[in-house]
Amino acid sequence: MDDAELARRSILGFGEMVATLGGDGAVRRPDAVGAVVGFAADNHWLDAAVVPADAPPPAADDAGLPHCLWTVADAVPGRREEPRIAMPCLGLALDRRAPVASVEVDQPSLSELGEINDRAYGQVEQLAPLVRALRDDRLVTHGLRADGAFACVALTLRIGDDISIQYVATEQRFRRQGLASRLLTAVMARALATGATSATLQASPDGLPVYERLGFRRVATLKAFLRAA
């Protein structure tokens, strides 16, 4: 599987995850996939949409679009780039992975997953309210426990034969113990066993080294363009 296809899948996964979170605010059109989320209008990853890999950006700003538009393009009419938050898109062909030993992975509730993410990223009721309301058969939660409680979590969205890995988070006191690597290795092994051929995600600065050690490679960079004030 080449980089262009992995990039297409990663970008689609990000947009479809945001649209799924957005509920009634979902935006799905040929040049933008995401959601308008009013209470998170200052969050560039929740009140957001992505331009599909094979589409040009919208020709002009549109009040029906969220405040942040992500794209691989170098410019978007009517918007200004925020270069500090450019986001690497990563992908991995699962058929290249060797068998791995299993670890015990449980399924946290959506509420638990959202709350752990908010704590991990220093937010209060940003992601959690949206995640609690999710109702989609393509979504699966995953988690590892430590001291009897969930310490590391992730959410996957199945799109065709790709799993889009989203909202990986580890509680502060359990970081730097390899939990995220162990969890994602198990998640990908399970996905491969159910017919998935790729895993894709978007990386934060903290997560990027973890994902690269797991074999993910950078296949694109999404740039953030904000509505001009």
Label for each model-derived stretch:
Residues M1-G64, A75-V76:
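N-terminal charged segments
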Residues A55-A60, T170, R176-A193, R213:
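Conserved acetyl-CoA-binding loop-helix of GNAT-fold acetyltransferases
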Residues M1-R9, A101-L113:
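A short beta-loop-alpha structural element at the N-terminal edge
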Residues D74-E82, S181, A193, P205-L222, ...:
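Conserved active-site alpha-helix within GNAT-family acetyltransferase domains
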Residues A40-E104, F225-R227:
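Acyl-donor-binding surface of acyltransferase catalytic domains
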Residues E125-E171:
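A conserved beta-strand-loop-helix scaffold within acyl/acetyltransferase catalytic domains
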Residues N43-A53, D161-Q172:
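Conserved acetyl-CoA binding element of GNAT-fold acetyltransferases
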Residues A63-T71, A191-A203:
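Conserved GNAT acetyl-CoA-binding A-motif
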